[in-house]
């Protein structure tokens, strides 16, 4: 299971700088891979210190972390929903992502002009929101024109879709995002998911600030944080230019020293990647052996057979049981054998809900 996040924002808010920081994330852990698929697409690793600690005990041939695909989506201007600027390309690219990282400018710099002349992250947010909402309304109206005829003829599925579409339409016409709409039944939720509405995607608002404000933010970031809470969205503060400087440092020690001088325990890039991972309700289980220590991504709440299927579909089809070691137990006892001896290995069936950090070994037969 892969995670794909799109970075969006108006011109000159620091979007490309942030993408460059993320693209340099490989330098923070030399063993972890990074590759560029296209000039504006990168695959970066999800930071997880548990893998390194397990590797010190297991001595595997390699460490394989979870990955996240980041897409630097072309800058947006007013009228994108009508195809202005790079609008159609922008909206096509964002539709393919799982979550949105929305960069908002919260710093003053007379050398970097703002497209609207002043610094106002709330206004900037609303510009992009409006364009996405208009595109979603266009999508909904097109679907309604087709679906209402089938619903009138008595088609049960069409009736369900019409009710979902109208619920979204009502909210969007009020200038609100589709993600605030909640559906009670699984059928409604599945129908809503299959519409792939832009404003239904989870969003992380990233407030780009100056180096001096990297730790605590400022009055503008506080406004964004308050608005994000109202929406049920996430927000964070990052100094993208400073993160770019940190990424250029060669040694891990120099990076940590720089962070300490700023009063930060962890780089903003690492925090952002973790937040993006959590934004989609994703967690990690681990397999640990002589060949590799590997992180596997799954949806929170998944049961053992579903997680087995992440490794291979045969594992899910022929699932017998899962041998589970809690991460803390593995670290405490130092090896799988010692965990077994201590009676700390769990033998779990098909109803076991996998927990973040579980070290799993699946038994199956096909």
Describe the predicted segments one by one:
Residues 1-113, 141-142, 146-147:
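Conserved G1/Walker A P-loop phosphate-binding module
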Residues 2-8, 13, 19, 146-353, ...:
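C-terminal-of-GTPase-core extension/linker across diverse P-loop GTPases
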Residues 30-31, 112-116, 217-219, 249:
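Short amphipathic alpha-helical segments
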Residues 34, 48-51, 64-70, 84-98, ...:
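Amphipathic alpha-helical transducer elements in NTP-driven molecular machines
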Residues 76-82, 117-132, 151-156, 212, ...:
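Flexible beta-alpha connector loops of hexameric P-loop NTPases
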Residues 95, 99-102, 107-135, 139-142, ...:
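Switch/coupling subdomain of P-loop NTPase systems
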């Amino acid at each position: 299971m892969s995670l794909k996040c799109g970075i969006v924002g108006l011109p000159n808010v620091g979007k490309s700088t942030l993408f460059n920081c993320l693209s340099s994330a490989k330098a923070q852990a030399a063993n972890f891979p990074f590759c560029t698929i296209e000039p504006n697409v990168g695959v970066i690793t999800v930071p997880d210190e548990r893998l390194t600690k397990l590797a010190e005990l297991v001595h595997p041939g390699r460490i394989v972390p979870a990955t996240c695909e980041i897409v630097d989506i072309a800058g947006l201007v007013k009228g994108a929903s009508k195809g202005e600027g790079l609008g159609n390309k922008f909206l096509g690219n964002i539709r393919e992502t799982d979550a949105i990282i929305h960069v908002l400018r919260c710093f003053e710099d007379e050398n970097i002009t703002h497209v609207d002349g002043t610094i106002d992250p709330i206004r900037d947010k609303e510009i992009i929101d409006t364009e996405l909402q208009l595109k979603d309304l266009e999508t909904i109206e097109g679907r309604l024109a087709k679906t209402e005829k089938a619903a009138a003829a008595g088609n049960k599925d069409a009736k369900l879709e019409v009710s979902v579409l109208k619920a979204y339409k009502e909210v969007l016409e009020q200038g609100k995002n589709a993600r605030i709409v909640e559906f009670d039944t699984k059928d409604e939720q599945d129908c809503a998911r299959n519409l792939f509405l832009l404003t239904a995607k989870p969003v992380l608002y990233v407030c780009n600030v100056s180096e001096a404000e990297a730790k605590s933010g400022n009055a503008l970031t506080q406004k964004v944080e308050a608005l994000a809470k109202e929406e049920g969205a996430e927000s964070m503060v990052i100094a993208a230019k400073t993160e770019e400087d940190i990424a250029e440092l060669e040694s891990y020690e120099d990076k940590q020293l720089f962070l300490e001088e700023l009063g930060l325990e962890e780089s903003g890039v690492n925090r952002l990647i973790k937040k993006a991972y959590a934004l989609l309700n994703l967690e990690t289980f681990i397999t640990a052996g002589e060949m590799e220590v590997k992180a596997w991504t799954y949806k929170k709440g998944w049961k053992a057979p579903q997680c087995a299927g992440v490794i291979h579909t045969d594992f899910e089809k022929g699932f017998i049981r899962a041998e589970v070691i809690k991460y803390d137990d593995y670290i405490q006892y130092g090896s799988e054998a010692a965990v077994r001896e201590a009676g700390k290995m769990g033998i779990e069936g098909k109803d076991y809900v996998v927990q973040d950090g579980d070290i799993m070994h699946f038994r199956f037969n096909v």
